[in-house]
Amino acid sequence: MADTPTFGRYAEIPYDQMTPEQQDAYRSLIETRGRLPGPNKIYVHNPKLAKVMGPLGAHFRTGYSLSEREREIAVNIILAKWGSAYPTNAHERAGKAAGLPVDKVEAILAGLPTSFTDTREQIIYEMATCLANARWVPKGIFDRAVAALGHVGITDVITLMGFYTSVAMTLAFYDVPADAPGMAR
């Protein structure tokens, strides 16, 4: 392992210095993403974890119950709560690229109230804000979420927020800055 940090405080492991298990996890993540972004660089250190986190992250990229706009509402709410620079910067851009209005993304990241005209987007905003702030959801919001999203959508939002909580905490612990390039692969 390199002694000099290459990704915030984290010193990435050159591929030829990885254990066989780490190399296997690395290849698995590359196959899933085509690259090794963000916390995946760190997860390689723990091959068993990497083999769980990679597929979970992949679930939230294609073929699940949320639109990209809906995803970015929930992700930006939880990332704003944690304040980790690297993923917050990436998902501020992703939210805007998904078509969320700039003022809505900026309000979410600043912790300011906002609203959405789309029913699903609004209930995702409400439930995610409740979960991130109060860590409890009132019955009325629960009922509206069930009606708008169903339990599949609700569990996608909740698990997505948990996944990005882990991402934010990992990158905050290693103090990864917003513009961290990491080691060339």
Label every PLM stretch briefly.
Residues 1-185:
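Hydrophobic alpha-helical segments
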